[in-house]
């Protein structure tokens, strides 16, 4: 599970860097102050995501699970906050699917490599 969590974090970093300005502006619009990330809170998030990833049996299943997890967050946020853009919810949900699919493939490759 720890390996899966690390893989997901490493795969997520480029997305977070690419979308950082968008998310920062969105949060600032919603809360009226700049985004300040509590990095320690990412630990239980990635551990939970890693746990979910290791339960997957296929890349397609992983993609579906990732999209579902991200959709729960994004569309709940969309439902609660007027200033949360629909396009952010859709893009981030799609990213959740891509992230979990890539994570599943990377984790599978690591498992094969560890058996050699």
Give residue ranges: language-model regions.
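Juxtamembrane/disordered regions of integral membrane proteins
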Residues: 1-116
């Amino acid at each position: 599970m720890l390996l899966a969590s690390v893989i997901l974090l490493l795969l997520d970093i480029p997305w977070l860097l690419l979308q950082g300005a968008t998310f920062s502006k969105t949060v600032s619009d919603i809360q009226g102050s700049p985004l300040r990330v509590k990095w320690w809170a990412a630990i239980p998030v990635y551990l939970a995501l890693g746990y979910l990833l290791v339960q997957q049996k296929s890349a397609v299943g992983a993609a579906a699970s990732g999209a579902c997890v991200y959709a729960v967050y994004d569309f709940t946020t969309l439902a609660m906050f007027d200033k949360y853009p629909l396009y952010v919810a859709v893009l981030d949900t799609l990213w959740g699917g891509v992230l979990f699919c890539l994570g599943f493939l990377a984790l599978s490759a690591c498992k094969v490599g560890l058996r050699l």
